Regions:
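Active-site entrance/lid segments in N-terminal catalytic domains of soluble metabolic enzymes
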Residues: 1-168
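Small-residue (primarily alanine) positions within well-ordered alpha-helices
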Residues: 128-131, 192, 274-275
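Single conserved hydrophobic/aromatic residue that forms the stacking wall/gate
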Residues: 270-280
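Solvent-exposed alpha-helix faces
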Residues: 57, 222-224, 276
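Conserved active-site-proximal phosphate/metal-binding subdomains
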Residues: 151-173, 179-272
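Conserved acidic functional residues
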Residues: 121, 176, 277
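Active-site metal-binding loops of divalent metal-dependent hydrolases
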Residues: 20, 177-178
Length: 280
């Protein structure tokens, strides 16, 4: 199948394995690329830029097909050394970068001068248009269905993708709830030129995830996700479990308009205690 996405990234199938923290390692990435899709290493999973350079080199040994690197620009009190991570990407011969999080405009000249094609993750049409304006080559349009961070607009792919098709000139892929051939057909029908899958790839044998987690994902129904961190406007879709239930109880205990720092502190305190209990 040929689309503008397969032509842009020189891949056989318009399927991208999106960057996922602690999942996007070379074993999974190479498997996806060798199968004709586009595998993506997650840069910030690697503790240092040197570790990223080593992971890129390892992946080159496992595939001669195109693969990319995800670089997420996260809001934090102290930014990771993004320039050094980008240097590792460039020196590693990477020609495709998936950006996410904050606006990547600051880093676009450095990436483009190295001949790198950039696909940016967006959860709205307005963000997609901004990505197009700053020179991104493509965008991944993430509907409200997506795992991880779906944004704050709550627009599902059935509405978001056709709107993106109406507005964008650059190619885009659909993301959010994508899992099989039906997903790809629907994405193409809505105007996308491929799809980005994340959670589905966690359930593969190459993903470095415990089999119990993989089985839980496979057995989960469409009713078993929850939205957490909404009061902080950092909404995250997660698979329901006891810890998620506790987080939601903590959120409910804080009245609307109350100090978000207090909510964050309570959530962090709970997760820290839960981690200590789990580790014994």
């Amino acid at each position: 199948m040929k689309t503008r996405i397969t032509e842009l990234f020189n891949i056989e199938h318009p399927i991208i394995q999106g960057g996922m923290h602690f999942v996007g390692f070379s074993e999974l990435v190479a498997a996806v690329s060798n199968a004709g899709g586009l595998g993506i290493i997650t840069a910030l999973t690697q503790p240092t830029p040197k570790d990223l350079a080593n992971e890129i080199a390892k992946c080159h040994d496992m595939t001669d097909k195109p693969f990319g690197v995800n670089l997420t620009f996260i809001p934090s009190f102290k930014d990771p050394p993004y320039d050094e991570y980008i240097d590792a990407i460039i020196q590693g011969g990477i020609k495709i970068v998936e950006t996410a999080g904050r606006n990547p405009e600051k880093y676009m000249p450095q990436l483009k001068e190295a001949g790198i094609k950039v696909i940016h993750k967006c959860t709205s049409v307005r963000h997609s248009l901004k990505a197009e304006a700053i020179g991104c080559d493509a965008v991944s349009v993430d509907g409200f269905e997506c795992g991880g961070h779906p944004g704050e607009d709550d627009v599902p792919n059935g509405i978001l993708l056709p709107r993106a098709a109406e507005e964008l000139k650059i190619p885009f892929v659909a993301s959010g709830g994508m899992a099989n051939a039906r997903s790809l057909v629907s994405a193409l029908a809505f105007g996308a030129e491929g799809m980005n899958m994340g959670t589905r790839f966690i359930a593969t044998k190459e993903a470095p995830v415990h089999n119990n987690v993989k089985q839980r994902l496979v057995e989960a129904s469409e009713l078993e996700t929850r939205l957490v961190m909404r009061p902080l406007r950092n909404t995250e879709r997660v698979l329901v479990n006891n810890a998620v239930d506790q987080i939601m109880e903590i959120e409910a205990s804080h009245k609307e308009g109350s100090d978000p720092n207090a909510l964050l502190e309570d959530c962090l305190l709970y997760t820290s205690d839960a981690a200590d209990e789990y580790s014994g």
